[in-house]
Amino acid sequence: MRLQANCCRIAWHWALWGWCLSLVLSVWAGNRPPNIILIMTDDQGYQDLGCYGSPSIKTPFLDQLARDGMRFTDFYAGNSVCSPSRAALLTGCYPTRVNIPGVLFPRDSIGLHPDEVTLADLLQSVGYATACIGKWHLGHHPSFLPTRQGFDHYLGIPYSNDMTIDPKAQLAQTVRWREGMSRERMLSQAPKKNWVPLMRDEEVIEYPCDQTTLTQRYTREAIAFMQANRQRPFFLYLPHTMPHIPLAASPRFRGRSAGGFYGDTIEELDAGVGLILSELKRLDLEEDTLVIYTSDNGPWNLKNGHGGSALPLRGFKFQTYEGGMRVPCLMRWPGVIPAGSTCSQIVASLDLFPTLAGLAGASLPRDRTLDGVDVLDLLKGGVFAGDGVPRDHFFYYRGRQLEAMRRGPWKLRLHQEVELYNLEDDLAESINLAERYPDRVEAMREAMMAFDEALKASSRPAGSIQ
């Protein structure tokens, strides 16, 4: 009852957008493009869902999502850290191509260039209502914020929750100060780590934000957005703050999971997904909505219940081993995606850009290079082999350095030593076959060098306020 009441209080913020166009857009009823809900967690490991084999974390709603849709075994984030991964997702490009190779901080003056065409830009251009609710992390200055990158509305934190605040941030007149903070103290004191602002659109509305409330606040905001835009196609991008450290969970979930504090955060995320799915059903939008759940990269290598698990993969966040970039991914679209199906083909987050644009009827930009490929036929359950697969390779960047390449089952990694693995037989990357297959190593090395050279020759600038 409390959640429903809170949703009603939030709903007025979205109502004007939904109602003012409902009559015009009602002609789409029965033949409109699908709603798209894209949920992305922060630093969630490959194993950290029941449907991916977690021995201790319970995720009944996400497990049901897997049973009702498709589970991906070989889905890759665009990078092994936050900002580059998000840039890849929203532009359909390897992050080096758009010059977002590393994590952005409150002190930085750069962000995703306003001239980049984002997924939200494309969907907005064909009539979608768009909202970003959660962690942005592609630049916190006004020209880089979601409202300048194709989103009608934004609620969330501008970067990671272990950061600080930029004292130059625009403050709302009704900003809520917490922990004894005030405008004067914010300007006179050194920024405090883990104290981050909560923003609505382009203004700070709470500082420091109460991180124990974020998952539930994002969920309420998402539900209100869905309610207000039920009569038109909508794109809900929900990049959750959790389970990035410092971990936080509401009192209801704190201490509940056998997976420790980290498990608490995942189980609260799962409950939030359950509420969103329930609301879709209540609004009679299940058949009209594609729901996607994934993570921005692999988990932190942390103990004491604060880090996730990438097992059976090797590696963690920051690394180009599989555990750093292969992430869980679930998709459901009743009547289109076969229920209870599994996709074991290579798919990457940058493929969502052309795939979702195609579903929405949006034209891809022709004045720039994209790296994503349309994988709609895979979502429909298509079976491909040999040269017919939509994607047969993937490149693993670490910063500006191209460290690895996958081609089919083979993966070449060039870091401190030359490593060659057959992922089909050796998912844990434990048996180095480089000396056994020197010709394969050389062919893949040449392919890596050629791709990297071409990419950097055609890369586009990041945005800068200087």
Regions found by a protein language model. Name each.
Residues A11-S26:
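Bacterial N-terminal signal peptides
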